[in-house]
């Protein structure tokens, strides 16, 4: 039963958070209308599309791992019961907080819209402060040495080149 509740909670939080932050808000800002490519380089559009294609599945996978393995959600009001250290979490501690701004940044490049660049940067800054002030201290208190080992081996923002092997 716990897994079912976790899946439903994660699905609801996915709609409330990433779908709104990386879908609705960028659409509201740009109406997904193409503007001239940044600096006249059409290649930026392809790079943007690649960021979107890489970011969306990464965020979805991370949400699924929270529900199915962590038996909770990414939302602070319904946190995981277990520390999730598989999948993209073997490369970076915050794949959702990396993936959502990457999708927004990708849309900025794809649509050639500077406003989305600023939005992505401000959102990432908010995520960074939230991680430092709330999330990391809470995870340390909740999971203790297990989290400290994870934290010592997996970077916060820039992914490792090789997967961390959980001892």
For the regions a protein language model found, what residue spans apply to each?
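Membrane-anchoring alpha-helices and their flanking helix-loop junctions
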Residues: 1-86, 98-167
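Solvent-exposed interhelical
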Residues: 89
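Extended, alpha-helix-rich binding/interface surfaces that flank or overlap catalytic cores
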Residues: 94
């Amino acid at each position: 039963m716990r897994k079912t509740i976790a899946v439903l909670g994660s699905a609801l939080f996915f709609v409330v958070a990433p779908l709104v932050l990386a879908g609705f808000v960028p659409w509201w800002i740009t109406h997904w209308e193409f503007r001239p490519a940044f600096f006249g380089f059409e290649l930026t559009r392809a790079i943007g599309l690649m960021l979107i294609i890489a970011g969306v599945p990464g965020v979805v996978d991370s949400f699924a791992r929270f529900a199915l393995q962590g038996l909770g959600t990414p939302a602070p009001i319904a946190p995981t019961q277990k520390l999730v250290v598989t999948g993209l979490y073997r490369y970076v501690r915050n794949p959702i907080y990396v993936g959502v701004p990457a999708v927004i940044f990708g849309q900025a490049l794809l649509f050639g819209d500077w406003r989305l660049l600023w939005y992505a940067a401000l959102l990432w800054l908010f995520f960074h402060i939230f991680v430092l002030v709330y999330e990391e201290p809470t995870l340390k208190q909740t999971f203790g040495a297990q989290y400290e080992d994870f934290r010592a081996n997996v970077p916060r923002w820039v992914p490792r080149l090789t997967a961390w092997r959980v001892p």
